[in-house]
């Protein structure tokens, strides 16, 4: 993401002009734009025209509109963002108050104005504009006949390809059908890797599976690379890391990211940090349950006692339509930081973020037990807020 201009007043009102450059930047933008903001961007509008003979036709024109945002729709796999609202600035083609939907596009700038820029949103802009926060991990999660090729960016896990091939069982004395199907499966996975993984960007490619599937696949991959003199694969051989996963489904990626070998190799990535923080929370919940709580009310009480060591919070909570509720989460984050606690904002598009959402989206590891919280522990599991 490129920051073109930033003009925010002392009362935190103001506007920023940004240019999304990567598909992931559309996800950041989705987290920046909120109902009630004003958005100015270039868009296509269908307009009616009348010729000198009186015949009416229509054509599409590119114009710049400023909308008061009413609805936001994000397609995570296509990384497309549509913003619907009413026009609030005079325009040659669109009346004041008329509805329009702007589809924000990569490499086309937009200006976003807010009455209140909070700390969470401003921090996201900083992160989005930092070139170090780029996609740096790829993963092939597989079992016989099923594979998911994923990109793990700092903000989301993107499934780039799914490969499914029916593998017949081995029969006594006749394995040819099984072997042919397996080779066809491996070949499709290799093609998907070459099509979807940018080797000049990724630091590491995880190959995760149960049993010996990953070893057999990697043997096939590099035998074929030698046979076909595939320099791209051979030069990047050191980036491939084999780890265990219980299945070829996307959710098994979390197991791969938890592997100590992977964790040390990816220690500087946000995704690995999220996985470790959630893992630490579950361990604390199991071994010292009076120092691990989830649910907003419980966590707020722990914060009042200045007991929070690590706050785990889902980014989807900052997209809440109700301004007061959204502000409540922002205040919690600011307060934990002021009290020297660590704040981990989880992406709801990561496997770890999905798990945190099942725990109400907010959890905390405490520095020390808070007696009144321990007495109410039973309430947290039913708490939704």
From Swiss-Prot:
One of its GO terms (cellular component) is cytosolic ribosome. It is found in: Cytoplasm. Pfam families: eRF1_1, eRF1_2, eRF1_3. There is a cross-link at residue 162 (Glycyl lysine isopeptide (Lys-Gly) (interchain with G-Cter in SUMO2)). One of its GO terms (molecular function) is stalled ribosome sensor activity. It comes from the Eukaryota. Keywords: Cell cycle, Cell division, Cytoplasm, Isopeptide bond, Metal-binding, Phosphoprotein, Translation regulation, Ubl conjugation. SUPFAM superfamilies: Dom34/Pelota N-terminal domain-like (SSF159065), L30e-like (SSF55315), Translational machinery components (SSF53137). One of its GO terms (biological process) is positive regulation of BMP signaling pathway. The modification Phosphoserine is found at residues 374, 380-382. InterPro entries: eFR1_2_sf, eRF1_1_Pelota, eRF1_2, eRF1_3, Pelota/DOM34_N, Ribosomal_eL30-like_sf, Transl-rel_pelota. Its cofactor is a divalent metal cation. Ubiquitously expressed. Component of the Pelota-HBS1L complex, a complex that recognizes stalled ribosomes and triggers the No-Go Decay (NGD) pathway. In the Pelota-HBS1L complex, PELO recognizes ribosomes stalled at the 3' end of an mRNA and engages stalled ribosomes by destabilizing mRNA in the mRNA channel. Following mRNA extraction from stalled ribosomes by the SKI complex, the Pelota-HBS1L complex promotes recruitment of ABCE1, which drives the disassembly of stalled ribosomes, followed by degradation of damaged mRNAs as part of the NGD pathway. Component of the Pelota-HBS1L complex, also named Dom34-Hbs1 complex, composed of PELO and HBS1L. Interacts with PINK1. Interacts with ABCE1. Interacts with CNOT4. Belongs to the eukaryotic release factor 1 family. Pelota subfamily. This is Protein pelota homolog. It comes from Homo sapiens.
């Amino acid at each position: 993401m490129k920051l073109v201009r930033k003009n925010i007043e002392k009362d935190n009102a103001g506007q920023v002009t940004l240019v999304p450059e990567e598909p992931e930047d559309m996800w950041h933008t989705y987290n920046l734009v909120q109902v009630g903001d004003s958005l100015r961007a270039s868009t296509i509008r269908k307009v009616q025209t009348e010729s000198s003979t009186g015949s009416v036709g229509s054509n599409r024109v590119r114009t710049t509109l400023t909308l008061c945002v009413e609805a936001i729709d994000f397609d995570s796999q296509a990384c497309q963002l549509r913003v619907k609202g009413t026009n609030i600035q005079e325009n040659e083609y669109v009346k004041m108050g008329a509805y329009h939907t702007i589809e924000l596009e990569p490499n086309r700038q937009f200006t976003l104005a807010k009455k209140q820029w909070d700390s969470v949103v401003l921090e996201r802009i900083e992160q989005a504009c930092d070139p170090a926060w780029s996609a740096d991990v790829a993963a092939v999660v597989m079992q016989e006949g099923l594979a998911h090729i994923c990109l793990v960016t700092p903000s989301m896990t993107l499934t780039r390809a799914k490969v499914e091939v029916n593998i017949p069982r081995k029969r006594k004395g006749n394995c040819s059908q099984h072997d042919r199907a397996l080779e066809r499966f491996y070949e499709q996975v290799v093609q998907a890797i070459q099509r979807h993984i940018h080797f000049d960007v990724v630091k590491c490619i995880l190959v995760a599976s149960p049993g010996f599937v990953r070893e057999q696949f990697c043997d096939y991959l590099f035998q074929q690379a030698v046979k076909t003199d595939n320099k791209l694969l051979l030069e990047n051989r050191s980036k491939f890391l084999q780890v265990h996963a219980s299945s070829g489904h996307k959710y098994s990626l979390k197991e791969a990211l938890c592997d100590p070998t992977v964790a040390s190799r990816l220690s500087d990535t946000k995704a690995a940090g999220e996985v470790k923080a959630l893992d630490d929370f579950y361990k604390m919940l199991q071994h010292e349950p009076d120092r691990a709580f989830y649910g907003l009310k419980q966590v707020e009480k722990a914060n009042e006692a200045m007991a929070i060591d690590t706050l785990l919070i889902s980014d989807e909570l900052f997209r809440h339509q109700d301004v007061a509720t959204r502000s409540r989460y922002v205040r919690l984050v600011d307060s934990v930081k002021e009290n020297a606690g660590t704040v981990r904002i989880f992406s709801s598009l990561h496997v770890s973020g999905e798990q945190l959402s099942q725990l109400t989206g907010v959890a905390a590891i405490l520095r020390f037990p808070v007696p009144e919280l321990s007495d109410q522990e039973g309430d947290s599991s039913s708490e939704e807020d």
